[in-house]
Amino acid sequence: MIPLDPAQRAAELRCRLQEANYHYHVLDQPRIPDADYDRMLRELDALEAAYPDLATPDSPTQRVGHTIATAFSEVRHTVPMLSLNNAFSDPEVLEFVRRITACLGETAPGFSAEPKLDGLAISLRYQNGIFIQGATRGDGVTGEDVTANLRTLPTIPQRLQSDTWPTVLEVRGEVYMPRPDFEAYNTQARLRGWKVLANPRNGAAGSLRQLDPHITAQRPLSFYAYGIGEVTDDVSFHRHSEILASLRAWGFPVSPLVELVYGSEELLNYYRRMETIRDTLPFDIDGIVYKLDDLSGQREMGFVARAPRWAIAHKFPAQEQTTTVEAIEIQIGRTGAATPVARLTPVQVAGVTVTSATLHNADQIARLDVRIGDTVIVRRAGDVIPEVVTVITDSRPLGATAWSMPMACPVCGSEIVRETGAAVWRCSGELACPAQRKEAIRHFVSRRAMDVEGLGVKCIELLVDAAVVHGVADLYHLSLDQLLRLRLVTNAQTPTMLLREARDHVTGMRYQQLEEILRTVGVDLSGEGDVPKHWQIDVLRAQWPDFDWNHKKIATKWAQNLIAAIDRSRQTTLERFLFALGMTHVGETTAKALAHSFGDLAIIRQLPWPLFKCVPDIGGEVARAIGHFMDQPANQQAIDDLVERGVRITDTHPPTSTLRDQLTLASLLEHLDIPKITPLRAVQLAALAPTLPLLAEAALDTLLQAGVSQPAAQSLTEWFQSPDNISLARRLQHCCDVLLAQLPSADRAHTAPLNGQSVVLTGKLASLTREAAATRLEMLGAKIVGSVSKKTSFLVAGEDPGSKLDKAHALHVDIWDEARLLAFLGQYSAQ
């Protein structure tokens, strides 16, 4: 039993300390001396130590004191943390405003103009006014739980002020390190022999991701709020400026530099003023964010891909420095793109040591006339990617010659080619090129593709160089023995060290075999000769004797975890699989659109390129790239190999009925991009024959007599004279007929069982991912939303559902468990 006086005193101290925090960090009006604050904090800490039941999660004493974590858990954002499109010039800002005025019909709409802090974006979740969880932005959909570390920031309220806040509130903002505090920290770090921080942004990000909150508490971090995520229905807003005002009232610091401005002229004036005072601010900013103030206007403008159309980041010119070009090298990407890179004399740019900079492509080098030995101006584009922007030709050394793209790939020796009209040169080696294979595998296992955790860049390079992995399908044949060999060899800095470590796992004749392998690759075991440069790769390529691995002498958990992660990736969704294939021009959005429209890998891999234009937002260039990829026997073999090794698509479904209008003969003629065949002319031609092959037989005179114009008729007949085009037309018609046969009937299309229904998913599902479940439900007409409200049709609840389930009960929303969901999906599939 807690005596009454200590409980009252603890409550009083918490109230006074929270009020002091609010006045100090939000209002910038300290009410009590620091000494008094420290005295009250110590008194409260002593009371909570004497009476542990007095401690509350929102107590100021809880800002430090959590145990060290072993890793950060994932947090799925209820409302995605979107990225912003960038503007680097005034005309881009003017175009941004023009689009909004044209859409909304307003001549001078209001915008919230806010400095873009150079820190780490986070999301703070409050329930009933109490801070319960904080997460990093991550990839915008999933972040890391850094709640314990965020509790150490005095600028983040543990309990909200006032009593007007909603039941559930997600606050979005930026954790940053003030410049004076950053400099003071580095001064102390140098005196104490600690590692100094590279720049305030890296300092903020690294500090917030410390596993030990005590370390975070020692770092001078601060926070500004700039928006909201999920908010329950008991609070509503009409303007973004109202949101910021409410955040201030609830205890959050909001930048005092935020202004409400009207029209493009005021936007640019604000930008100029901030650019002028940028270097005098106590924190780093890399631009200005403009947000449409009217929330109904925001909803009308909507989004494109992962960015809102009602907001934009107007970036400042990046910081620049001069340095010297020591060499120009070629890097080969996963699609074969040959990107020239300048190797530079190291130079500090925006707090980072820059040793190389992109030259983008051969045309850019020609425009700049960059040569080896030149003095150049380097900047960090967007303050992230270093690039060469100008050559100081007055400093050019005598004899410097113009650079030209090499004709052979520096990695595999294949010809480097450029398609007519393209800016990018590409290695023609495709998957025969180790550089492309490495990048293809790196992309394949990435988080938003097949999501194989634990397979890093260095490991991928060694697996490819050692010929253990030739393509992505080989990952599914990796064994524990292969991975342990990799670790044993790479940990050995010298051949002698390898032999010493190997004695724990192999003896006798097999040990002698290993010695012979080393001799074969050119190693002098006497230790007198030079060690071959690539001895580790050559040793890994050799036929090894069997090892009896001593698990006490070599770490195996990482290898077991990696094999388990690879195995888990065998079950995936169609959009992830398509994205993982790394097709040129196919990002996540396009992969999702393909999966939604066609629904089945077996269909997609057989389609000719024009049918990909049936998918919304896929144009001719992207469609041709997808078709080209699927037409390559090596790529088809790679897909076969993946399927053979157990990769399964878990969300296969029939093609969407919306394709029907795109599969008419007139639409097919449009998709073929035949010169002179306009949409109107395509409709006219479609009336002359039921199929493409029959239309191909029509003579020029027949077309002219039917009223087709001379240019269009001539163009069509010439196009059909090509055997390749005839073959394409026949294939296109056949695939079109197959697709039409698989489409849901028109009646079924209009009576999708979930048309108009809003569905929320929460908790973990055992049989399929929430992502896959959402896709299946969307195919049946449902709209997937992030929060429960009175308008929610039903909630799908898996394990550990959280507060959404409680709210669904309170609002009498229908609740489905996983069994009911699977039964419903199975019933539809059966139909």
UniProtKB/Swiss-Prot annotation:
**Chain residues that bind Zn(2+):** 409, 412, 427, 433
* Top-level class of the enzyme under EC nomenclature: ligase
CDD domains attached here? BRCT_DNA_ligase_like (cd17748), LIGANc (cd00114)
Question: Which Pfam family, any one, appears in the UniProt record?
Answer: HHH_2
Q: Which residues cross the membrane?
A: none
Q: Where does NAD(+) bind?
A: 34-38, 83-84, 114, 137, 174, 291, 315
Its biological purpose is as follows: DNA ligase that catalyzes the formation of phosphodiester linkages between 5'-phosphoryl and 3'-hydroxyl groups in double-stranded DNA using NAD as a coenzyme and as the energy source for the reaction. It is essential for DNA replication and repair of damaged DNA.
Q: Which family does it belong to?
A: Belongs to the NAD-dependent DNA ligase family. LigA subfamily.
Designated name of the protein: DNA ligase
Source organism per entry reads Xylella fastidiosa (strain 9a5c)
